[in-house]
Amino acid sequence: MRSVLKACDLEDRFPILAVENNCIVSKDADITVAFEVELPELYTVTAAEYEAIHGTWVKAMKVLPNYSVVYKQDWFVKENYRSEGDGTESFLSRSYERHFNERPYLRHRCFLYLTKTTRERARRRSDFSTLCRGYILPKEITDWDSVVKFLEAVEQFEHIMNDSGHVRMKRLRTEEVVGTEECPGLIERYLTLGMEDTHPVLQDICLDPERMRIGDKRLCLHVLSDTEDLPGSVGTDMRYERLSTDRSDCRLSFAAPVGLLLSCNHVYSQYVFIDDAQEILQRMEKTSRNMLSLSKYSRSNAVNYEWAEMYLDEAHTKGLVPVRCHCNVLAWAEDEEELRRIKNDTGSQLALMGCVPHYNTIDTPVLYWSGIPGNAGDFPAEESFYTFLEQAVCLFASETNYRSSPSPFGIRMTDRQSGVPLHLDISDLPMRKGIITNRNKFILGPSGSGKSFFTNHLVRQYYEQGTHILLVDTGNSYQGLCSLIHDRTHGEDGIYITYEEDNPIAFNPFYTDSGEFDVEKRESIKTLILTLWKREDEAPRRSEEVALSGAVNAYIRRITENRDVRPDFNGFYEFVRDDYRRMIEEKKVREKDFDIDGFLNVLEPFYRGGDYDFLLNSDKELDLTNKRFIVFELDNISGNKVLLPVVTLIIMETFIAKMRRLKGIRKMILIEECWKALMSANMSEYIKYLFKTVRKYFGEAVVVTQEVDDIISSPVVKEAIINNSDCKILLDQRKYMNKFDHIQRLLGLTDKERGQILSINQANHPERFYREVWIGLGGTHSAVYATEVSDEEYAVYTTEESEKLELQKLAKELGGNLELAVKRIAEIRRERKMSNGKA
């Protein structure tokens, strides 16, 4: 005959009486205030910051009255990533979202319950749980003053935590606890073990201790309820070996192994019971005396006496607060095989903390029941152990998932732990918060580190959000993306300009739309001519600077007073040769102060009939105003020390002109390796000017380099670029680990940032193809993210010549349809990966 378990309605045993004024009131008159807690992001906290977080928890708990319970509940629930697209995205954006669709990850939410209970309730054992009896109201229910004092202490607790700058607490409203018609509340979520935003189906709760179930979910419980199960010592944090090196540390909280590092559905519960400290110590004194008197009969009594004395000595000499503590991991699965795996995984993670895994099969229902929000006062006293407040808080999980930026603008990067997309704003939101003062970016990544993939990924998303982008490249890194944009816009955008002998890049430095020459325009002209005149390592004398400035200003006066004169470099050269020569002769400027003949001789190749006469005498301007994606490819002249700096300056001046015309529109100039041509002492002021000016016009300048020696050896880089780039982006630096001290000093990196950077690509997931990247903002906010792209994006971004040629050949076979060729290539890549996986 089948045994039938006794059943009852949840309502008959439910321990919560009401939720009023945002407080949970139990049927035993316990009052609970609930909070949602925002913890720091995983892998972004240092040992010192963990100690600060620990100290804040301790300080906050000390303001709570006796017989309070601090119950921290961390939920870790498996979910699948859902695409956020609305059908209006670009081809590559859709591919990106499709690539990640349904990817599983562990979602974390942290709640904190502060409960005021009574002396009698604090001592009750599991056999006196509300699961087993009715309700007896304590006499304290009539003491309204104790309630008021508790609520005042809760407010102090909240202020202390929020003022710390590391942890944020938000008090939950009544509807968030009990739920609404549209959304389940916290209590309903706990009773169904689900974090969905829709009401779950009603389910039976089976409270069999050995096989507890909630609907189809089978539960297992591991507890830390005895000091014998704990390690000999605990700390605020621990070294995470997988992301550490012999030159850097990655730190995690002591309880991190049972947090995000435990990849299954689970709730990690941490209880701290604040009883009467004096009463606890008196009881310990009595126990100590008893152990001493019985020590002759058993050696264990003598050992217990010594432990009790040590505990009392610590409490009295250091002023430590004695408390009771309990932690447990409640995990669940929907089939027996998975449940067995989860049991083993949970036990292994507890062992990583130095704890003895204790699988509880007796008190699972009672411990689950006391975990109901507002019912912490029902916790069985025998499941807790005595310790000090400082040690108890060490068992708190202190980190959470990466968070997306609450901003409409940004880029999609990937969480390095779970591999799901994040929305990251590294420009606007940090500016509004005062984290950075400019949007400029400095990118450092050696060859093969994924630098081109990241920059392609960055500019593609900026472009799709309306940014005007101008790129100066020397390696055809953006050819695929530019071609795709060109095809999608039917030639209206995606302009790819290469320097060719029969069609060179040219412009007129003396041309302006309005005919006006402000200070900035005059300075750019002087910088250009100085670059033509002086060698890279040759700084001008003060007298030469004055003479050049006088020549430029005098010529500008001439062309502004006489509009019939066509301004160009030829006209300037002739003006200096004839008119300005007479002017300096009248001033009696000595030849050693300004050698005008030497000046003209050096500039002659750029004058009419010279080798480069086309460069600065263009009769038409590069009209880039309405083109949003332009690439200047300068690979053909990357080794020409005369042309490269001049052409790069021309392009930058063109960008500045565009920048001034487009009001209220985001602009970006990204300069790849050719920035090195601009690093002479003569150009440092102009580079500083560019980096400072773009901020005023809603723009950002981005410099990309791969050689560490370039930044170590050039003081101009530090003064002109690094100091004016509040966003620094570094890729894998392992090959420069021995040189990293120099890089750290030059970039002004903290030890925390150093540890993050050297952890890049140390523990990548073997089944995913991605490269990690470190992003630092203003020296105060930083983290490592992953650049993972879809197969379609890979086909567009790749810099491998064989892969680029394969794509171009296929596009030609398909009648020039590049998008279709990208889709075909991506499908081939997916088929290869599937076949390799099967093999």
Where are the predicted features?
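Short secondary-structure boundary/capping segments
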Residues: 85-90, 126-131, 374-377, 484-489, ...
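P-loop NTPase motor domains
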Residues: 40, 47-63, 262, 355, ...
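Conserved P-loop NTPase motor cores
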Residues: 427-460, 469-481, 495-503, 635-755, ...
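Extended, folded cores of ATP/NTP-driven motor/assembly subunits in large transport
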Residues: 1-399
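A short, charged
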Residues: 443-467, 809-839
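Conserved P-loop NTPase
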Residues: 750-811
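Short glycine/proline-enriched loop/turn "hinge" motifs that connect secondary-structure elements
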Residues: 23-29, 101-106, 317-322, 414-416, ...
